């Protein structure tokens, strides 16, 4: 068995690149047949993952954040076991297993290598796989606007997201949608529509407190339009994961979601931005063999 660590060298302010020595120490202490691949450009992690096949007898490891994991999941053969070493800025997927995602990295690496793979669900949106979430609304707009600021100005990631959060929290734009959640049809104006496989997204927002990665269902969060005072109150609950059963935010368990809008809107899947007016999302039950260190 070969262990291949795919490292995003810029992830987490170079945190992933800086733990290469730690990966080597643990791997050599275990006498592993291992290889470290460092990404050089966007989608390089996907290309690296695509180069391995199930009969290669290999385990892949995502060393970075949610974006690195997204690339690998979209490139890999799903019969290949995958481990996640949280070395990004958000690590929202890993928070499902460790709420603060701040455990000792040496122990995480060691325990992930030793872990027996477990089958978990993933989502598919169009031709993109995702492990955590696909959403439209304020969260996707904030993500897209921050990314544009980073790309087109000298503003760095932290301030860019802060500016985008402030601007869009004041504007409070809604999106009019017609959606189907399995056989249920819904139409209305919403601030956020988040189709959750995991619990967390957006750097620690617990949108789906009761989500499971192996129940064969999404938790579809629908944040309805309301007056400004109520919206801010609900938003605080939403950010802290205290919104289950609260009037104004519905959570529907479903396997298939279709969302139609009357114009192109910002969307995101595990932090990857795009625009669409038609989104078709399906659950793929127990599709990914994940090595979980706990």
Regions of interest found by a model, annotated:
Residues 68-80:
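Short Gly/Thr/Asp-enriched flexible loops that form oxyanion-binding sites at enzyme active sites
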Residues 135, 139, 194-208, 273:
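Glycine-rich phosphate/pyrophosphate-binding beta-alpha loops
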């Amino acid at each position: 068995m070969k262990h291949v660590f795919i490292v995003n060298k810029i992830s987490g302010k170079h945190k992933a690149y800086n733990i290469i020595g730690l990966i080597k120490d643990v791997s050599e202490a275990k006498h592993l047949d291992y290889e470290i691949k460092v990404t050089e450009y966007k989608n390089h992690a996907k290309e690296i993952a695509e180069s391995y096949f199930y009969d290669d007898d290999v385990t892949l490891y995502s060393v970075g954040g949610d974006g690195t994991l997204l690339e690998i999941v979209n490139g890999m053969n799903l019969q290949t076991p995958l481990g996640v070493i949280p070395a990004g800025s958000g690590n929202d997927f890993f928070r499902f297993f460790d709420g603060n995602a701040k455990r000792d990295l040496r122990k995480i690496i060691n325990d992930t290598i030793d872990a027996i793979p477990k089958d978990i669900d993933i989502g598919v949106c169009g031709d993109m796989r995702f492990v955590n979430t696909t959403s439209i609304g304020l969260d996707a707009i904030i993500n897209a606007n921050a990314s544009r600021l980073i790309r087109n100005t000298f503003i760095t990631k932290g301030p860019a997201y802060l500016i985008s959060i402030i601007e869009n929290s004041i504007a409070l734009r809604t999106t009019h949608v017609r959606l189907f959640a399995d056989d249920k049809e819904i139409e209305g104006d919403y601030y956020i529509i988040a189709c959750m496989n995991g619990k967390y997204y957006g750097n620690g927002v617990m949108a789906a407190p009761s989500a499971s990665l192996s129940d064969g269902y999404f938790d579809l969060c629908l944040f309805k339009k309301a007056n400004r005072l109520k919206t801010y109150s609900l938003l605080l609950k939403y950010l802290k994961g205290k919104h289950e059963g609260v009037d104004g935010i519905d959570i529907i368990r479903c396997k298939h979601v279709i969302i139609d809008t009357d114009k192109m809107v910002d969307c995101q899947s595990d932090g990857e931005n795009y625009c669409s007016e038609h989104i078709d999302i399906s659950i793929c039950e127990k599709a990914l063999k994940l090595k979980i260190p706990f």
